[in-house]
């Protein structure tokens, strides 16, 4: 049998699409002003909308490197959809302790309970039209999770984020009274 016969039936793994973003943040509420050069891997099963919500979550939490960890930490993108045990974003201090675990979308109860056991604080950024229904079903099961915060982003706004998505992006965000 030739070499091509060995490869028959072997599925080809799809690769993530790489996006580069320069994000200028002016967080007036926290006195945080910075520029971040970021690389985002968009998993083949991830939508651009979800990827852009991850970028928004980064911008909303960039100040935590200084306000929570006095600069002794890093906020980074996790494996996300590629690894269900890894957050979409993680703030880890230099001892390796996870100070903030960020999920995007509608994670299940088990994932949020596991995240709460591994991090000081867990934030979920829900954005789809079905997020309210998802939360009404999952909230009673998570009533003991004091570390958990839910942020509901309007789906009309998150869909508009897709118009900004490009393989190379330069974005500015001003945060005030948020």
Stretches with model-predicted labels:
Residues 89-91, 96-112:
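Conserved catalytic cores of phosphodiester-cleaving nucleases, focusing on short active-site segments
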Residues 29-81:
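Acidic-basic catalytic patches of nuclease active cores, encompassing PD-(D/E)XK
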Residues 2-50:
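Extreme N-terminal leader/targeting regions
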Residues 134-178:
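Domain-level recognition of nuclease-like catalytic cores that cleave nucleotide substrates
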Residues 111-115, 137-138:
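A short acidic, amphipathic alpha-helical/loop segment
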Residues 101-103, 121-126, 149-151:
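Short hydrophobic alpha-helical runs that function as membrane-insertion/retention elements
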Residues 123-138:
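Nucleic-acid nuclease catalytic cores
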């Amino acid at each position: 049998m030739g070499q091509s016969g060995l490869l028959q039936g072997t599925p080809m793994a799809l690769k993530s699409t790489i996006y580069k973003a320069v994000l200028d943040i002016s967080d007036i509420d926290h006195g945080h002003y910075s520029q971040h050069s970021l690389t985002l891997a968009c998993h083949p099963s991830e939508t651009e909308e979800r990827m852009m919500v991850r970028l928004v979550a980064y911008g909303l939490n960039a100040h935590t490197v200084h306000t929570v960890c006095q600069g002794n930490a890093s906020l980074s993108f996790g494996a996300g959809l590629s690894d269900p045990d890894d957050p979409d974003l993680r703030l880890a201090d230099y001892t390796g302790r996870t100070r903030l675990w960020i999920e995007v979308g509608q994670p299940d109860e088990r994932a949020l309970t596991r995240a709460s056991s591994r991090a000081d604080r867990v934030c979920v950024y829900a954005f789809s039209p079905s997020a309210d229904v998802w939360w009404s079903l999952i909230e009673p099961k998570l009533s003991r999770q004091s570390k958990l915060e839910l942020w509901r982003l309007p789906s009309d706004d998150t869909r508009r984020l897709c118009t900004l998505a490009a393989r190379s992006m330069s974005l500015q965000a001003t945060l005030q009274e948020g």
